[in-house]
Amino acid sequence: MSYTSSQEVRLGQRPDASDAPLYNATIAEAFTRYWKRYATFSGRASRSEYWWMALISLAVAIGTTSIDVVTNGSFAEARTTATGVGDLLSYAWGLAAIVPTVALGVRRLHDTNRSGNWIFLGLVPFIGVIVLLIFYLAPSNPAGVRFDRASGG
């Protein structure tokens, strides 16, 4: 199967369809798109979309842990009790973010022309997570367009 230039979104362009990856996304664009595509498992996500959200999630984890340390007095105590404000915020973020995070991971796999079923590799201890990390770091593959929904009905 060959791909014409009209079927591909070039790097640096903003896609017309919501299924197309947003290359060179800013942190604000990645965050907005993450929540707008909350449970969308079709389509693709660029590396920048994926890694900006990974950075935001890391920042939330650091922030909620910091709140726990400040309110509990020490890091060790903050990690042994699950009753602090930081814990509640962490649980709220985790519950709100689980579905869009999995959906984003599936779309990122699609952008590398891999089936979303590879996401289950993350359930394999150590090796599975490392392999997924390599997949998420992989460059976009134009053949991943096959995971976009057909336009026009």
Regions found by a protein language model. Name each.
Residues E49, M53, D87-G94, I119, ...:
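Residue-level signature of transmembrane alpha-helical entry/exit and packing/kink sites
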Residues I119-G128:
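Short hydrophobic membrane-inserting alpha-helices and related fusion/pore-forming segments
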Residues S42-G43, A78-T81, D111, L121-G122:
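Helix-boundary and loop/linker segments of multi-pass membrane transporters
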Residues T26, A30, L58, D87-Y91, ...:
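Extracytoplasmic/secreted proteins, especially bacterial periplasmic and envelope-associated proteins
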Residues S2-I56, A103-N117, I134-G153:
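Membrane-interface extramembranous regions at the lipid-water interface
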